[in-house]
Amino acid sequence: MFSHLPFDCVLLLLLLLLTRSSEVEYRAEVGQNAYLPCFYTPAAPGNLVPVCWGKGACPVFECGNVVLRTDERDVNYWTSRYWLNGDFRKGDVSLTIENVTLADSGIYCCRIQIPGIMNDEKFNLKLVIKPAKVTPAPTRQRDFTAAFPRMLTTRGHGPAETQTLGSLPDINLTQISTLANELRDSRLANDLRDSGATIRIGIYIGAGICAGLALALIFGALIFKWYSHSKEKIQNLSLISLANLPPSGLANAVAEGIRSEENIYTIEENVYEVEEPNEYYCYVSSRQQPSQPLGCRFAMP
């Protein structure tokens, strides 16, 4: 079971690595400027990190077909029609492409090279270029409100009175458009930050699970080794105890059994003779040592 754990951890990390980049689609028309947002938050003011923009999806390392690159201080490489519109010193590394054509369609990679292993933030932004729409030039409408102030006529018993309310305030469409763009960029930046944070949390969780499984495997191997060593040690101690048993005890036990069998007997001999009617008998006591002479008693009639 444990042999499959390292392989599963590698697959999990590869899956998280491949799904790290996000893809968002943006549209523009031929002849317009295309805007591809990309943001990050510097750790401290002026503490910048390298950023690269490339044509094509984000590879495992760096950017492919680099069109713009920054370092910790300034923009050190760019090609024509590609430039940064925002303040990159504050983390705004959004790319602007001037006067786009149909050939500019495709996926662009924004890679924020944060120091550390697998800490880079990768964003794949799909740019779709549409042909320009042919529309008649709009005629400029005259602001009649500004030219003719509103008149309020009151009728009463006396002569009619005319009051001037003044012209309505002009609405600056340029300011409204700029505000809408800023709100859109802010919303996109928040979405990108949330996506990056979610992916990073997923990677940390996967790495933690792999580390926990590896530690469990190591502890299991150590416990198994300790158990085997303890069992072998107990067997060795048992053999040593049997080998160290005093031989005298075993020999004494055997000799005692033999001696008991030899000493428990009685020699009785009766001699019946016509010529000598005397009888005699001998006995051996169980307490008498084998080396002592036999004790015999004679009985006379």
Swiss-Prot record:
Quaternary state and interactors: Interacts with HMGB1; impairs HMGB1 binding to B-DNA and likely HMGB1-mediated innate immune response. Interacts with BAG6. Interacts (phosphorylated) with PIK3R1 and PIK3R2. Interacts (not dependent on its phosphorylation status) with FYN. Interacts (in basal state T-cells) with VAV1; AKT1/2, LCP2, ZAP70, SYK, PIK3R1, FYN, SH3BP2 and SH2D2A. Interacts (in activated T-cells) with LCK and PLCG. Interacts with ILF3; this interaction promotes ILF3 ubiquitination and degradation.
Superkingdom of this protein's organism: Eukaryota
All copies of domain Ig-like V-type, residue ranges: 22-124
Consequence the record notes for mutating Y272A: Abolishes TCR-induced NFAT activation
UniProt tissue specificity: Expressed in T-helper type 1 (Th1) lymphocytes. Expressed on regulatory T (Treg) cells after TCR stimulation. Expressed in dendritic cells and natural killer (NK) cells. Expressed in epithelial tissues. Expression is increased on CD4+ and CD8+ T-cells in chronic hepatitis C virus (HCV) infection. In progressive HIV-1 infection, expression is up-regulated on HIV-1-specific CD8 T-cells.
Keywords noted in UniProt: Adaptive immunity, Cell junction, Cell membrane, Disease variant, Disulfide bond, Glycoprotein, Immunity, Immunoglobulin domain, Inflammatory response, Innate immunity, Lipoprotein, Membrane, Metal-binding, Palmitate, Phosphoprotein, Signal, Transmembrane, Transmembrane helix, Ubl conjugation
Protein name per Swiss-Prot or TrEMBL: Hepatitis A virus cellular receptor 2
Residue positions where Phosphotyrosine is found in the record: Y265
Residues bearing carbohydrate: T145, N172
Transmembrane regions listed in the UniProt entry: 203-223
Subcellular location: Cell membrane; Cell junction
Any one GO MF annotation of this record: metal ion binding
Membrane topology summary: Single-pass type I membrane protein
Lipid positions (S-palmitoyl cysteine): C296
GO CC term (a single one): mediator complex
Annotated source species: Homo sapiens (Human)
Free-text description of this protein's post-translational modifications in UniProt: O-glycosylated with core 1 or possibly core 8 glycans. Phosphorylated on tyrosine residues; modestly increased after TCR/CD28 stimulation. Can be phosphorylated in the cytoplasmic domain by FYN. Phosphorylation at Tyr-265 is increased by stimulation with ligand LGALS9.
Binding site for Ca(2+): G116, N119
Residues in compartment: Extracellular: 22-202
Residue sites binding a 1,2-diacyl-sn-glycero-3-phospho-L-serine per the record: R111, M118
UniProt xrefs under InterPro entries: Ig-like_dom, Ig-like_dom_sf, Ig-like_fold, Ig_sub, Ig_V-set, Immune_Mod/Transcr_Coactivator
